[in-house]
């Protein structure tokens, strides 16, 4: 078994626990042992515009806790958390004075940031570390004939200067992950558009419009479902689908599903174990087509 430290963040265990449920079901079947981290905190992302150092420090602290396990790999499921950790690692590994300042504070907790971790997002972890052959061997119910649209989200592909999960202009890894399950990932012009979540508190109408226009475009494709991997994006498209539809004057009925839920269905895992009963969009239509 490949042992991997997993950072769940705040949103997943507090609100989007269907994501956690599905991840805990599918990873062991792929030969991955999940190591939960104790005493971790928020990644720091919400603090960036208020206190940049505090934001960076929280990411550094969480990575130091992960390093203390002795593991080499840290898996992050939230796009925003992944960007926060990646930015912190970049700055700490290139600025010795900043690193010393952070470590002097971490020392009070018996922690030290070393910069030794390989930071993964779910998408590149499954695509690059696990791979097609391993995933396909676990499938009991291939999704042949299913047509879906993918959503990468902004933070795992931008900024490209940090070395992100996939190409910022033409990402393919998530689409390939979908097609390894037997489904068809449909390309569309709005594929890289933002979900709007970052604007929800400051400019709610703009946020809902972003999500609504993208969902309206996806519905026009005639696909069977919409696949994502970020909890914040998922809340915009799944939990708030009625609201975003009303904002753009559209009645939306797009089934929205996490990739790990879709993978779990293809593995033959029971729907409830994957948290599919917690999805707010009309997921039954998608599940009926798979069955």
Residue ranges, per PLM feature:
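Iron-sulfur cluster-binding electron-transfer modules in prokaryotic oxidoreductases
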Residues: 1-291
């Amino acid at each position: 078994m490949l042992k991997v430290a997993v950072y769940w963040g705040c949103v997943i265990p507090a609100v989007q626990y269907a994501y956690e449920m599905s991840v805990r079901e599918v990873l062991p079947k792929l030969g991955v042992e999940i190591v939960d981290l104790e005493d971790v905190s928020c990644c720091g992302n919400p603090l960036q515009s208020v206190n940049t150092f505090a934001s960076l420090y929280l990411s550094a602290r969480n990575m130091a806790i992960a390093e203390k396990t002795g593991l080499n790999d840290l898996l992050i499921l939230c796009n925003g958390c992944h960007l926060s950790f990646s930015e912190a690692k970049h700055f700490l590994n290139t600025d010795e004075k900043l690193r010393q300042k952070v470590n002097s504070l971490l020392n009070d907790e018996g922690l030290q940031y070393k910069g030794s971790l390989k930071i993964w997002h779910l998408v590149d972890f499954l695509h690059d570390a696990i791979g097609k052959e391993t995933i396909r061997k676990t499938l009991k119910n291939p999704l042949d004939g299913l047509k879906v649209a993918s959503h990468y989200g902004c933070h795992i592909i931008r900024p490209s200067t940090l070395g992100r999960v996939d190409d910022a202009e033409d990402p393919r890894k998530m689409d390939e992950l979908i097609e390894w399950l037997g489904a068809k990932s449909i390309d569309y012009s709005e594929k890289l558009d933002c979900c709007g979540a970052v604007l929800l508190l400051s400019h709610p109408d703009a946020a809902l419009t972003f999500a609504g226009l993208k969902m309206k475009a996806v519905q026009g494709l005639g696909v069977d479902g919409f696949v994502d991997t970020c909890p914040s994006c998922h809340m915009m498209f799944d939990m708030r689908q009625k609201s975003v539809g009303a904002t753009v004057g559209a009645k939306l009925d797009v089934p929205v599903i996490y990739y790990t839920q879709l993978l779990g269905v293809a593995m033959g895992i029971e729907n409830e174990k994957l948290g599919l009963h917690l999805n707010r969009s009309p997921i039954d239509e998608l599940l009926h087509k798979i069955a």
